[in-house]
Amino acid sequence: MAKHACAELLSLAVHEFRTPASVVSGYLRMLQRDSTPLNDRHRKMVDEAEKSCARLVALVTEMSEVSKLDAGVTALGKEPLDLFVVVEELAEGVHEAADRDVRFEARGQATGAAVMGDAARLRSAFAAIFRAILREQPAACTVVADRRVAAHDGISSAVIVVAEQGTVQAAYESQPAAFDEKRGGLGLTLPLARRIIEGHGGRLWAPASAVGRGAAIVALPLSESNR
């Protein structure tokens, strides 16, 4: 009952926020297009207002996704994909902390993680997790997304350990703890990521031991034909 009430409240908030955010965004575009040329100071102010408005619109969209997933009204796609290949492709395009000389790469088993899932949503979930972990690393280090297949209680799963390269195995062997979704600057992308992963029958957790400055572990069950 409480979960249903929370989902209804979130849905109402999304509806109430969406219209004013869209109106403000539209007026800002009109201001830039129709007004006399702005000086540098005013242009910067409008640019910052547009960025903030775009962030608010993105947050409303994330709230909508969370609300729909909680209410069970969003159907996750089911298509065959190799999760390890998806992780590899994502890792090649991640540059979240490149300015601090933090490198990111996929390692471990390159293929063989056949799952049935929603490719677009899984990509967004893993991208959010990667950004969160990279933000917490010290300068000049290498973070890896280590890919392996592991069996637990007779069920084989694709396991991805995201951690600084020297702490991967320790993170994998550590007791599981709750993954902190309340990291600043990432909006609702991490709560959304957890819901997407759990919607695929998987789990997202952090190592309980103090290994490195941040790590995340994801496990998704393989397709029955691949177990």
Where are these regions (language model features)?
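Conserved C-terminal segment of the DHp
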Residues: 23-38
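Conserved catalytic submotifs in the C-terminal HATPase_c
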Residues: 77-80, 103-113
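Detector for a conserved hydrophobic position within an alpha-helical segment of the HATPase_c
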Residues: 197-198
